[in-house]
Regions:
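N-terminal flexible segment immediately upstream of the FAD-binding catalytic core
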Residues: 1-106, 124-156, 308-313, 375-399, ...
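C-terminal substrate-recognition/cap domain of FAD-linked oxidoreductases
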Residues: 54-80, 283-473, 481
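Short, well-ordered beta-strand elements within core beta-sheets of diverse protein domains
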Residues: 90-96, 270-277, 341-343, 401-405
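FAD-binding subdomain of flavoenzyme oxidoreductases
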Residues: 146-302
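Activity-critical C-terminal alpha-helical subdomain
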Residues: 491-532
Length: 532
């Protein structure tokens, strides 16, 4: 069963190993555990619904409302763990068809209600949280719209309901010999409609593309009517309407159907790990790889601190010690950086790609360790979000943030973001452990994905204040140093204040005009993407 106050399935537990706890204690200090609220305590706080008129497609059940009240950001985690949710949706709608979505939008308008589209509930930027409002709030969950509706094998276009999560998408496609190839870290829970709405990026985007390359068309239900976006392989017929929906985050309408470009399942897939002696050699190596257009399916480069942290938290200290000895003998010592890469395709193509990658990385001092660490990465690729629970139990808070920039700015921006976080709680005498990886690389530049660990305060309010201070410092640094405010998490409410630095006043006015066109009364996700 899915956790009501954290990530994923209750049966999946990722604990912090003892030597990992000692590693963090040395870097950050002794952990401080805060007391968690129980579900029963939270249920007692859920008020009566303000939606007096009932509808057969909505639920006002208290637990259903609790389970749809928050996403997965650290503030959401603190709210769920403390039991201080603040605001709950007045009801949760559960449509099964596009016609029912249209019916619910009309019903919500008649009730003068706000509508929050809800996919998998994995937002880490405040997309789905109800806020204080004089109007009742209807959360519209798409969790029952999960079916593969059509597969055009000639055109390789699949049509899905928007609520299909990653496993549901892949299971239905793989049964027919296809894959979407979109694997964000939230893959187990996040949905196809949510990926489109937030411009998601999957771990193997180097082969399959980001969601904007995969999204071929679909339908969106708006307060102004149904927007039907047909599929074309390419078109010069004016602006691309797909781009109106990609990244719209529910402000323009509710996605009711998604058409995506799919690929035949590959004959073979392998992942490898390489260690490079220094960050500068590693950075130059990964840039050379992607700009050489060697057909790899994924690249992930951890900086030296992330490499050290991953090895410390991996478990099996004896095996790690042997690995460290092997790497040191071959020139990858302190300051080394781990690069994981994958190949996906037919065997001959993969063999050539691996040969080319090895030759290129060897020129940057790369030390190859085969497929063992690559296999471990693939096996555990969706388990990192579960580690938040293990860290919390040990008395630590963890969060992530991300951006992207051109290659000539990657090193500078990464260092500035890390410094803003590392120094962010200095006025409280608190240390912050910060580390980064590059996981989506392009010929032009790269994403920058940073994780930070700090100690909670003595109260939940203090802990939230610490997060707010860190998040603001990093976001301001990103906006001031040529970074996008989001590469893959989206804008939501948390990043909305920084969007103008990227879009400009004229661009923001255009976005607001489009929102007004599709949603004249501003009922859909107010405050998300665009500050109201």
């Amino acid at each position: 069963m899915r956790r009501w106050n954290g990530w994923g399935d209750e049966a999946t537990v990722v604990e912090l190993p003892a030597h990992g706890a000692a590693f963090l204690e040395n870097l950050v200090g002794t952990g401080q555990r805060l007391k968690d609220a129980t579900l029963e305590q939270v249920l007692m706080q859920v008020p009566e619904s303000r939606l007096s008129l009932r509808h057969p497609l909505i639920s006002v059940d208290a637990e259903v409302r609790v389970r749809h009240a928050r996403g997965q950001s650290l503030p959401d985690w603190l709210a769920m763990r403390s039991g201080e949710f603040g605001v709950f949706p007045d009801a949760v709608a559960l449509p099964e068809t596009a016609a029912q979505i249209r019916e619910l939008l009309a019903w919500a308008k008649g009730q003068d209600a706000i509508v929050i589209p809800y996919g998998g509930g994995t937002s880490v930027a405040g997309h789905i949280n109800p806020v204080e409002s004089a109007k009742p709030v209807l959360t519209l969950s798409l969790e029952r719209m999960t079916q593969l509706l059509d597969l055009d094998e000639q055109s390789q276009i699949a049509t899905f309901g928007p609520g299909a999560n990653g496993p549901q998408v892949e299971a239905q496609l793989r049964a027919r010999g296809y894959t979407l190839g979109h694997f964000p870290q939230s893959w187990e829970l996040s949905t196809l409609g949510g990926w489109v709405a937030s411009r998601s990026s999957g771990q193997q985007s180097l082969r399959y593309g980001r969601i904007e390359q995969l999204f071929a068309g679909g339908k969106v239900e708006t307060f102004a009517g149904t927007l039907d976006i047909p599929t074309f392989p390419a078109s010069a017929a004016g602006p691309d309407l797909r781009e109106l929906i990609l990244g719209s985050e529910g402000r323009f309408g509710v996605i009711s159907e998604v058409k995506v470009r799919v690929t035949k399942l590959a004959e073979q897939e392998k992942f490898f790990a390489v260690f490079l002696p220094s960050w500068q050699q590693a950075l130059a190596g990964i840039r050379a790889l992607v700009q050489a257009r060697i057909p790899l399916s994924m690249l992930r480069l951890s900086n030296a601190i992330e490499t050290e942290t991953q090895l410390a938290l991996a478990g099996h200290p004896e095996q790690i010690a042997l690995l460290e000895k092997y790497l040191a003998l071959r020139g990858a010592r302190a300051g080394k950086c781990m690069l994981t890469f994958g190949v996906t395709g037919n065997r001959s193509q993969n063999a050539l790609s691996v040969k080319q990658a090895k030759k290129l990385l060897k020129s940057f001092g790369g030390v190859f360790t085969g497929t063992l660490l690559g296999k471990k990465w693939a096996e555990n690729r969706f388990r990192f979000p579960y580690l938040r629970h293990g860290l919390w139990e040990a008395g630590y808070a963890v969060d992530t943030l991300e951006t992207a920039t051109d290659w000539n700015n990657v090193d500078h921006l990464l260092n500035q973001v890390e410094a803003s976080l590392r120094q962010g709680l200095a006025d409280e005498g608190e240390r912050v452990h910060v580390f980064t990886h590059l996981s989506h690389v392009y010929g032009q530049g790269s994403s920058i994905y940073t994780t930070y660990v700090f100690r909670p305060g003595d109260r939940y309010e203090t802990t939230l204040a610490r997060w707010t201070k860190l998040k603001r410092a990093a976001s301001q640094t990103i906006a001031a140093n040529r970074g996008t405010i989001s590469h893959q998490h989206g804008v939501g409410r948390d990043h909305a204040p920084y969007l103008v630095a990227e879009k400009g006043e004229l661009g923001m006015a255009a976005l607001k005009a489009m929102a007004q066109h599709f949603d004249p009364e501003s009922r859909l996700a107010p405050g998300v993407l665009l500050e109201d």
